[in-house]
Amino acid sequence: MNPVISITLLLSVLQMSRGQRVISLTACLVNQNLRLDCRHENNTNLPIQHEFSLTREKKKHVLSGTLGVPEHTYRSRVNLFSDRFIKVLTLANFTTKDEGDYMCELRVSGQNPTSSNKTINVIRDKLVKCGGISLLVQNTSWLLLLLLSLSFLQATDFISL
């Protein structure tokens, strides 16, 4: 086999295997709603399929996604926001009946399909409230956050530059 073709194939496989790795899955409460943030890599041009599910009492319930069929009971309560590096699921009116293991799964199809997932155990009484500062930290680059912090500290005469 031609070495150039071998290297190209190897790079394609490596890109696909890294293209959708789930980095983190976090949960918090916004009013009475559960918010799940599924952060992931995206180093592929292929479509990334996704699925959010809940496992409760050893039974899997698909909430949203393109891999499985979402259960009818959750369709009216679920809202999904999808961007290049994050998928955010909001489950309205979260109660103790919705507690369990939540999973975010991503899959890239193609010649060598790959998948990646993360699971988080969600208990209502242990959930933190989603806050403005945590949103800023999650959605702003660290450099910008550092610059904003330095400006604030300088304005309050906490530091002098």
Curated annotation (Swiss-Prot):
Residues 1-19 form the signal peptide. Glycosylation is tissue specific. Sialylation of N-glycans at Asn-93 in brain and at Asn-42, Asn-93 and Asn-117 in thymus. The keyword Nucleotide-binding does not apply. Disulfide bonds join 28-130, 38-104. Gene3D superfamilies: Immunoglobulins. InterPro entries: Ig-like_dom, Ig-like_dom_sf, Ig-like_fold, Ig_V-set, Immunoglobulin_dom, THY1. It comes from the Eukaryota. Residues 131-161 form a propeptide. GO terms for cellular component: apical plasma membrane; axolemma; cell surface; cytosol; dendrite; dendrite membrane; external side of plasma membrane; glutamatergic synapse. Transmembrane segments: none annotated. Residues 20-126 form the Ig-like V-type domain. It is a lipid-anchor; GPI-anchor. Abundant in lymphoid tissues. Glycans are attached at residues 42, 93, 117. This is Thy-1 membrane glycoprotein.
